[in-house]
């Protein structure tokens, strides 16, 4: 089977031809969002940031703000972008900036659990869940909270916090809370992928605590910027306290870069020829079509099917093209180990609370890595091709 290649410039990881003939390992375990690099190369004159040596020297940005290290211009840019896309309410909310959404998730766990009268607070998420949640809830062995696993089977009495990722990482499904009681429960809505290049924007999310990350919108993971939209001032204050102890704020250089790029997104989002979201949607759609072509050409793998829905941002019915593929194997076998033999690294389903015959595959790699991963996947035509 021939697997087509997307048009792309040679990246710093080498050419498509060289890599396909080599023994290079393709790492699709990490969600390193380098897929959009080509778009930003064309924006170098409009998105380059120059910072004088004397600027941004203070710890403080706005001492009157609950989040005193949040740059005022970044706050404006965040509100403007959410307003333009229509994916989240920002009115009557406090914006807390963090070093990526992972730090903010930990800050939110601290804030919500420390405000609880009963401790430790149970932390749950529905299977398959984002694997890092387990690490974030368990690493410090905190007395404030404790990881309790699958939200669907959770029946423990007492306070709890449910982590809801929508669209879900790893399977791309839109999610709502599943714990069958509300007494003593709090919810953290992780909306990192609720953007129109991944999924139709069907409504404006309006929750008490919502997390977003710069990296998964634009691909600028190296800037380490995320933000939380928080309704309760006491929760916001607790989160800021955690961030103050943890890192004494967030890099102003990163905030300045994020401000420039978010403003560019807002400015061009309705211009089809320049819109990042148009570009991102077409790229993700193409990648998913090519992956499905490979999967459907054989009898070894499975992928989730996603319903089409009307996107309020694009004004038309669209398909879903998640940032990760939840790839399944039709027999009970460790799919991660099988793909590793093909020199493709993925995240095993057991890390997401599921069976090892599932893996999470990043759809956000550079073009050449994605192309070669499809070529290697295509060599596994059916179950008979694989030695037991």
From Swiss-Prot:
Entry binding sites for pyridoxal 5'-phosphate: 59, 101-102, 169, 190-193, 213-216, 224
EC main group: transferase
Pathway in which this enzyme or protein is active: Plant hormone metabolism; auxin biosynthesis
Any one of the GO CC terms: cytoplasm
Protein name (Swiss-Prot/TrEMBL): Tryptophan aminotransferase-related protein 1
Regulation of its activity: Inhibited by L-kynurenine.
Tissue specificity: Very low expression in seedlings.
Comp. bias intervals (Basic and acidic residues): 7-22
UniProt-listed Enzyme Commission number(s): 2.6.1.27, 2.6.1.99
Primary role: Probably involved in auxin production. TAA1, TAR1 and TAR2 are required for proper embryo patterning.
Region (Disordered): 1-26
Gene Ontology BP terms: auxin biosynthetic process; cotyledon development; cotyledon vascular tissue pattern formation; embryo development ending in seed dormancy; primary root development; response to ethylene
GO MF annotation terms: carbon-sulfur lyase activity; L-tryptophan:2-oxoglutarate aminotransferase activity; L-tryptophan:pyruvate aminotransferase activity
Cystine bridges: none
Induction cue: Slightly up-regulated by ethylene.
Cofactor: pyridoxal 5'-phosphate
Entry's family note: Belongs to the alliinase family.
Pfam families: Alliinase_C
SUPFAM superfamilies registered for this protein in UniProt: PLP-dependent transferases (SSF53383)
Keyword Transferase: yes
Modified positions (N6-(pyridoxal phosphate)lysine) in chain numbering: 216
Keywords: Aminotransferase, Auxin biosynthesis, Cytoplasm, Pyridoxal phosphate, Transferase
